[in-house]
Structures are given as C-alpha cells and as structure tokens.
Amino acid sequence: MAQLFFRYGSMNSGKTIEILKVAHNYEEQNKTVAIFTSGIDDRDQVGFISSRIGLKREATPIFSDTNIFEIVANIKPKPNCVLLDESQFLEKEHVFQLAKIVDDLNIPVIAYGLKNDFRNELFEGSKYLLLYADKLEEMKTICWFCAKKATMVLRVDDKGKPVYTGEQIMIGGNDHYYPVCRKCHANPPIK
C-alpha cells in the first residue's frame, strides 16, 4: 500500500542527498522515479535539485499553477515512486494532489523539506504535509554553534546579524541561513 511520507529537517540535514540516494536505489533495481522540486528555488538552476556536496540532477519544477497529479498520472510507464525536494514551498492544493497520487494511483510519495522558517513558523507546504502525511520522519543535523540537535533555522543579514522578521521566503544557502538549536536561535553566539 502506497503512503505519503514527509521527511523534514533543518538545513544541512541531508534532505537532497537522501533524494538522490533513494532515486539511485530505485533505478538500480530498474524502477522509475519522478522527481520534483520547487520552481521558486533558483539557487543553482530552476528544474534541478542540487546537494551541498555537489551532486545535481534534473527535476520537474513546481509552480503555483502546476498540477502534480496530472503530470504523474500521464507519465508512462507509471513511476514506482514520486520524490519531492523543497516541499516546504508547496501550496495546500499541491499537498492534496500528492495525497491523490498515493490514494488514486497507488504510488508512494516522499516529500523532503524544512518544517519551519527562520521565524519558527510553519511553511504552508510543511503545515499541510504534517496534517496529511501517513508517515513523518525527522532528519537530524547538529546546531551550527553548539552541536546540539538543530531544530530551527537562523537567518542572518549581509552583516551576519540575526533576523527574526521579514518575508518568509528568501532563497539562500549557508551565507544567510544556519541550522540551530532552540537556545542558539534565541541567542546566537555570533561575533
């Protein structure tokens, strides 16, 4: 029986590398995967997933008007698994489409993404994945500053000062965001 998985973690918890690993494992067994990513995330190039260790792979970009269910339903042969990167950027309707892929097409869907933003609020995609996923799995990493478990994301400005207000989405990497524990989120030891 297919299920909808939400594998969430802070930055640097290995979400993208895990997608690449899962895709490789399916393909090693001559099974097919459909890989999607947010069209918002243009750090490297729209339509690609890219890990911080340098591995990169093409993926179908998701925009506001993208119907993920229709795309997957029309793939021949039917994929054995659907993988999504940056799923925090999904909209509510996209999450419903993922559930429909699982329920109507009997294809497992594994969505990877951040749970909460730099203000420690849920992203829309994460909120609905937390509500609708059959299985929730935390991917762990350590705090940038103290090595406790990182559960939050700290945003810094161009001068390295912590930022706790502003637009939820600002695409960036390690130059503007850090995985942190709760204590270091509130009082980051930044010099």
Swiss-Prot record:
It is an enzyme of class 2 (transferase). Zn(2+) binds at residues 143, 146, 181, 184. SUPFAM superfamilies: Glucocorticoid receptor-like (DNA-binding domain), P-loop containing nucleoside triphosphate hydrolases. GO terms for biological process: DNA biosynthetic process; thymidine metabolic process. The gene is tdk. Homotetramer. Gene3D superfamilies: 3.30.60.20, P-loop containing nucleotide triphosphate hydrolases. This is Thymidine kinase. GO terms for molecular function: ATP binding; thymidine kinase activity; zinc ion binding. Belongs to the thymidine kinase family. GO terms for cellular component: cytosol. It catalyses: thymidine + ATP = dTMP + ADP + H(+). ATP binds at residues 9-16, 85-88. PANTHER family: THYMIDINE KINASE (PTHR11441), THYMIDINE KINASE, CYTOSOLIC (PTHR11441:SF0). Signal peptide: none annotated. The active site is at 86 (proton acceptor). Keywords: ATP-binding, Cytoplasm, DNA synthesis, Kinase, Metal-binding, Nucleotide-binding, Transferase, Zinc.
